[in-house]
Amino acid sequence: MGKLFGTDGIRGKANVYPITPETALRVGKSIAHVFGAGDNTPKVVLGKDTRLSGYMLETALTSGLVSMGMNVLEVGPMPTPAVAHLTKSMGADCGIMITASHNPSDDNGIKIFSADGFKLPDDVESRIEHYILESERGNELQGSRRIGKAYRIDDARGRYIEFAKSSIKNHSLKGIKAVLDCANGAAYSIAPLIFRALGVEV
């Protein structure tokens, strides 16, 4: 197996190595291993776009993460910048976005953010990749009392809407009419809400 991480995470055809449930499980375990050092229970924000394979990968990643004692904050379909923002604002140790950005719909990928919402440093990415490729780490699973928990964050959209509004404070968009075509992408649900909250007639 060759190098997994490219310039923007791990990408490829869905259900073809490396974008498989088996690899996603190992990615989750490896992320939890790297970020799980210390006494506190680590937590990760996990989002996705609207690709069909996102549900499959979300389930596998979550299984790997919680099996190693990491708590998962699932925010559902959200734009990539929203997941980056929520990672920082919710005090997570890292964030994961399941997306292949502009790639065809039958592709998918796994993108990881550091606690500040930015791209992982190369050395951290290399450590995660090492554990994915070289170590099964099955003997390091947490005991049954230390398995992590997965939470669905119901107000994730509201949190990002408030952030978006605050980023253009003192500017009114009232009186503007807009037609939005989100192409069934990650912003399909939240974009109209943000524009309406800013006074736009959508």
List each language-model region with its residue ranges.
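Gly/Ser/Thr-enriched, mixed-charge loops and adjacent short helices
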Residues: K13, N108-V202
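Ferredoxin-reductase
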Residues: A32, D39-D116
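Conserved beta-strand scaffold positions in the cores of enzyme catalytic domains, especially
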Residues: L4, V72-E74, G95, A150-Y151, ...
